[in-house]
Design a protein with these regions (language model features):
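N-terminal Rossmann-like NAD(P)+-binding domain of SDR-like oxidoreductases, especially those catalyzing
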Residues: 1-185
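Short, intrinsically disordered, charge-balanced linker/junction segments flanking boundaries
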Residues: 190-193
């Protein structure tokens, strides 16, 4: 399977790339290193012995994003590309909404145009806001988000589920995790803001 990992050099994305490569999938990465570092790609190779096919740009560049979809017969997308800092999102809400929502719209548009019907979206537990009940389960209702980052993630989820309702052949998986921590067992990959 050929999998596009948007934000594949980031903390979560790089771990996903390792798992995909170790499972013998072809991995294509788009990343602009705004939340990551170029050396992560070397660490992925050190761990797996395999290269990813890499494109350096922000998915906001729709023409370049379309070139990636044109050049590769992509089977699935794992969308981890987003601005991610809660505090910064409060200071820069316009930048967060512009980046996070527009990249998701572009990815969804390209998926539809190039008949890519599988997406896993890296969302966040922030979509629950201040939850009424803990621990949270998948059945908990979404709350009033408490910051622009969480609101953007909730909107990104809505975009993808609306597209899925319009295109029933599309499979959308939403991952709502809390702050991931730790490092890969190799010690090469870990959170490094």
């Amino acid at each position: 399977m050929k999998v596009l990992v948007a934000g594949g050099a980031g903390y979560i994305g790089s771990h996903i790339c390792v798992e995909l490569l170790q499972a013998n999938h072809e991995v294509i990465v788009i990343d602009d290193f705004s939340n990551s570092k170029p050396e992560v790609l070397g660490y992925i190779k050190d761990i797996t012995g395999k290269d990813v096919k890499f494109y350096e740009f922000n998915i906001l560049d729709e023409k370049k994003t379309e070139e990636v979809f044109k050049e590769n017969e992509i089977d699935a997308v794992i969308h981890c590309a987003a601005f991610k800092a809660v505090g910064e999102s409060v200071e820069k809400p316009i930048e967060y909404y512009t980046n996070n929502l527009t990249t998701t719209l572009i990815v969804a548009k390209m998926m539809k145009k190039y008949h890519v019907n599988n997406i896993v979206f890296s969302s966040s537990a922030t979509v629950y806001g201040d939850p009424e009940v803990v621990p949270l389960t998948e059945d908990c209702k979404l709350g009033e988000t408490t910051n622009p980052y969480g609101a953007s993630k909730a909107m990104m989820e809505r975009i993808l589920t609306d597209v899925q309702h319009a295109c029933p052949e599309m499979s959308v998986t939403l991952l709502r995790y809390f702050n991931p921590i730790g490092a890969h067992e190799s010690g090469l990959l870990g959170e490094d803001p």
